[in-house]
Amino acid sequence: MTAALFVVSEEGYWAEECIKPLTTLESAGVDVTIATPSGSPPVVDERSLDPEAAGGEAAAAEFREIDAEHPKLNDPEPIATVEATAYDAVVFPGGHGTVWDVNQDRHARQLLLETVAGDDGVALVVCHAVGILAFTREADGTPLVADRAVTGFPNAWEEGIVDEHDRMDDGRKLPYWVEDEVVLAGADWDAELDADTSVTVDGDLITARGPESSTAAAATLLDAL
């Protein structure tokens, strides 16, 4: 059976970016495992459950129900205990929370590196989780993302979320902006700001811009599998 690992934030994952790929893969018969940095259940960003952000009342209710009741989401594995070679795909959903935990986690970075470096695996990285690409390096120190085509959460959108001191509404200071770090690491960045969705495929690395691209990203991943 085809197997996929989801690496989800405990600091605030974006519901659509996790749940759309999760339900799409499960509906296609893919065996899904959930992992978080510590092994505690992931924490959804409440902003992503607002009907306006979720795409309507029905979608918001569905996301809230799945977050609360999905057995695997509520009983994850610690990242340090899973092996990339056990999975055909590794998925990194976004959400601002990833900038504080998943993107900075050495075991998460190793999972990504091993997935993309191998011959069989494929990685899907969404929205703010794309920041992990800036901090994942090959054995010789070369950034994994160097010269790769990617999309992700753009500065143009971040400007509308943080204040002049990079603080979010909840008071947390954003430690870095995804686009800045990924470009600095040598990526060929294009968030396709004029397009309704943005999904970029570069070999065994799939990246998606944000929530509105989650469905297309899931379909692209299924095609790759």
Language-model features: where?
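Extended, subdomain-level signal for the structured scaffold at the beginning of enzyme domains
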Residues: 1-120, 132-225
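Short, thiol/selenol-centered motifs that function as redox-active sites or metal-ligating centers
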Residues: 125-130
